[in-house]
């Protein structure tokens, strides 16, 4: 079993993905001391309308600094499947490969087939891949979603 912490990424919903530098340093120091394997630090995205802070876009300099602060941890970013397509993957992810180990994808079960194609593109670049399937209570309304799970360990 592996443990993933998503405190920063999830906290971004309350701070517009901006965090005080001292807070990040204290958080990173704490994470280095804990038996957590993966640290999900934010999103990586194409430009979107409206203001979203640097932890929504996770530019290279942010990831580089986080990796220095947490050298023993595997960094994770999340992609919002509704905004990201296969054609975005190389430009978004290749520059961050030295710093990020795992890419998670936030996905609505109704878009899961499209998310599988996105996951294959991400995996082809050498990243670990995981899904953050949203609206879990709706699975029973779409039994076809469960059928798509077969063979995903490949």
Annotate each predicted stretch with a short phrase.
Residues 12-21, 43-46, 101:
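Short N-terminal helix-initiation segments at or just after the protein's N-terminus
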Residues 11, 31, 103:
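Conserved, mostly hydrophobic/aromatic
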Residues 8, 25, 116-119:
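Hydrophobic alpha-helical segments
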Residues 1-6, 29-45:
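N-terminal glycine-rich anion-binding loops that anchor highly charged ligand groups
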Residues 16-26, 107-114:
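Glycine-rich anion/phosphate-binding loops
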Residues 38, 43-152:
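Active-site beta->alpha loop and helix N-cap motifs at the rims of alpha/beta catalytic domains
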Residues 1-16, 72, 128-134:
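N-terminal small/glycine-rich loop or linker at the start of catalytic domains
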Residues 23-36, 65-68:
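Alpha-helical scaffold segments that flank or form the walls of functional sites
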